[in-house]
Amino acid sequence: MRKKLLLLVAIISFLGLGAQAQSTMSKGQLVGSVKVGFSDYGLPIGVAADYGFVSGFINGKGAVSVGGELGLYLSNEYTHLSLAARGNFHYEFVQNLDTYLGLNLGLVGRSFALNGHLGARYYFGKFGVGLEFGMVNHAAGGTIGVSMKF
C-alpha cells in the first residue's frame, strides 16, 4: 500500500516536467503547515514551518528551505512528543505544485531521530494542501495537511 502511494505521488510530481512556472518556495518565504497522518509508530499530528533560505537556481525553479517541526505520535500504548529541525530541497515541476525532498533531525520521545521525507503541496493562492511520506526510526508513515504562505 505504501509503495503504491509513493508511486502515485512520484507520478503526479513528474507529470509536468516541461511546464514553465514561478517558484512556490522562494527566499524569505515562510510556510506554516498543520498535518495529521498514519504511521507504524502511532498517529502523527503536528505543525511545521519552512523558511525559504535560497531560491532561483535550476532554471529558477529550485529552492532550499530550513525550519522546524513539532508533533505528537499517539497510540493505545503511548504518546510521544517529537521535535525536529528540518531542511528541504524544493523543485516546482508544475505551476502551484511544490515538490520537496528533505531531512528532519531531532527527537521522538526520548530517542534521537533522523527522518527522510518526500512531499508535495498544491497551492490555491496562499493556501495549500499536501502529502508527505517518510521514515522515522524505522517506522514508515505519511501525513496529509494544509499549509499557508506568510
Positions of predicted regions on the chain:
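Cleavable N-terminal export/targeting peptides
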Residues: M1-S26
